[in-house]
């Protein structure tokens, strides 16, 4: 840390429209200028019908998308070190998805 340029203090505030949601679905859309992450919930109504209800879209610059990728990777590595490896199924499980 350079004493002539001290780090600024960061204060985190929540805006009035801040909200938290649960998501079991994310769609990623990419353009030259940005990434769009669309979070939603998957509901399987019948064996033939799966509905995805999109709840929130977040636009990120390519730089912020890469920073998110890095921090998620670090946190997933710590999670797996603590709780064990996460396995991703190549195919969705058969039967209803809740």
Residue ranges of predicted features:
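N-terminal intrinsically disordered, cationic/polar leader segments
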Residues: 1-63, 70-98
